[in-house]
Amino acid sequence: MSALQRKNFKDTYPIYELTLAKTQTRFDSVDQILERLSQAIADHPKATEIAHFDHYAHTESVDGSIAEDILAVKNLIFCFGWELPSPDPVAVRPRSIGITERQDDFVVNFMHAPNPVAQQSMEDWVTALANH
């Protein structure tokens, strides 16, 4: 299993990404992973789930481009939002965790959270998807 990697998407957006071989997780589908992450949000005292978004279906519906190796993609949209010290945090809320299925693996990723507690929660949720 690869470790949670930090990288910059388009040289600007800091994201964290975990690539899980299908043999390294107990989950068989994007929907199963989505449900597990939904439960983690439900269990968190400050997080609120907002929506599930089928990014693959949306991109198909607008005749968009999808890489050939991508089989399914969904986003789990949620918010921690326990403080509003200024208007600035609103620009990076709500949060989203993306789940992409390819032939042999799942890629789970999210944008860096400015709040360290939120960041650690998302890291914990995502890394817990791996078999231990």
Residue ranges of predicted features:
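Terminal, regulation- and interaction-focused segments at domain boundaries
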Residues: S2-P45, D54
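Short beta-strand element of the conserved SAM-dependent methyltransferase core
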Residues: Y16-A21, L76-W82, I99
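Short, surface-exposed coil-to-beta transition loops
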Residues: A91-R95
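Beta-strand/loop substructures that line and gate deep hydrophobic ligand-binding cavities in soluble
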Residues: S96-H112
